[in-house]
Regions:
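Conserved glycine-centered beta->alpha loop in an early N-terminal alpha/beta scaffold
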Residues: 1-86
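Generic detector of short, locally flexible boundary/turn motifs and exposed helical patches
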Residues: 2-4, 9-13, 70, 83-89, ...
């Protein structure tokens, strides 16, 4: 059966709004396009509304297969499956590959996270695979195509753009091919550290509250986060060895279509990694530097990779914070 988007009947919406008493309506904090991970590591595979997580699952359960009690060995196999998708990307360091995997984990469970950092793919030359990587990551959040937006030049423009983008509760917001650094626009900073923001809808006089449970991605050559954005963005560096990266021949030129067709398989890999880490007792690295505002994200998207022997996916965050020439401004 094919599903299509449609609005509910106006008369029912009007009756609900005029009724005033909305207590019978369950709270909805987000929409997920795949199964979710519970606090005990169990996977909720049923679609529809989940009163425990307050999420609405919009997916076909039979597309996803996760072991009932995943082990570390299951997690290692799942991680190998995801890393195989990243094999042809020219990551500058292994930590950048780890950050890309963390972005994929974030994409899968973004609706469950109160807040999550933005991910920015950076390279020195055109044709390095920046946009391709962001679109690959986006597939893990939604099987639909994602449209890209231009990065706003000032905070007023940024606020208007974010309100319009967040209004339909999208799984992904993407800023592609940035030509300027990622400025710390106040509205963007809030979206990255607050689960709900308020704003005035364009063309209307009313103010509304909007959920920020959306994965935010960006890419650009020789640009990145500055000042207060450095702690809100996880950079991923690509560094191809070719003089003209755009001429490179790929062994899997149709990778995006491959992943779309087998999305359930690869999303299940990400869920297996997180669930196995939780079932193992949620082991943490005591000496790991904390990333303020993103403790929940670190628990579910950072520590599992360290547990599996991968570099810290947030290492670049601390490097950029230290090296930022404008950090005192």
């Amino acid at each position: 059966k094919q599903m299509s988007v449609c609005d509910p009947p106006t008369k029912y919406l009007q009756a609900i709004l005029e009724g005033g008493n909305h207590t019978p309506l369950p709270e909805l904090i987000g929409i997920t396009r795949q199964p979710s991970v519970k606090e005990d590591g169990a996977i909720r595979t049923e679609s529809g509304y989940d009163p425990e997580t307050k999420l609405y699952g919009d997916f076909k359960a039979s597309d996803f297969t996760v072991p009932e009690a995943p082990t570390k060995e299951d997690a290692e196999r799942a991680l190998n499956g995801i890393e195989a998708l990243l094999k042809e990307f020219p990551f500058e360091e292994e930590g950048d590959r780890s950050a890309a995997v963390a972005a994929i984990l974030t994409a899968v469970i973004r609706a469950q996270l109160r807040v999550a950092p933005m991910f920015h793919v950076r390279a020195h030359l055109p044709g390095s695979g920046k946009s391709y990587l962001t679109y690959l990551i986006a597939i893990f959040a939604t099987g639909d195509d994602v449209g890209a937006s231009n990065f706003p030049t000032n905070d007023e423009e940024c606020q208007k753009l974010l309100i319009s983008l967040l209004l339909p509760a999208p799984p992904v917001i993407m800023f592609d091919n940035l030509t300027t650094d990622i400025f710390p626009h106040k509205s963007l900073c809030m979206v990255l550290t607050e689960p709900v923001v308020s704003g005035r809808i364009l063309g209307a006089s009313r103010v509304t509250e909007l959920s920020t449970r959306t994965l935010i991605l960006s890419s650009g050559n020789n640009v990145g986060p500055i000042r207060d954005m450095t702690r809100r963005v996880v950079p991923i560096y690509l560094n191809p060895t070719e003089e003209l990266p755009v001429t490179r021949q790929y062994k899997r030129p149709e990778l995006l279509e491959e992943v779309k067709k087998q999305r359930g398989k690869y999303v299940s890999c990400a869920l297996t990694i997180i669930a196995a880490w939780i079932r193992a007792g949620s082991p943490k690295t005591p000496s790991l530097r904390t990333l303020n505002s993103y403790s929940q994200w670190s628990d579910l998207c950072r520590y599992p990779l360290l547990w599996l022997g991968r570099p810290d996916p947030a290492q670049r965050v601390f490097e950029v914070m230290t090296e930022d020439p404008e950090r005192e401004q």
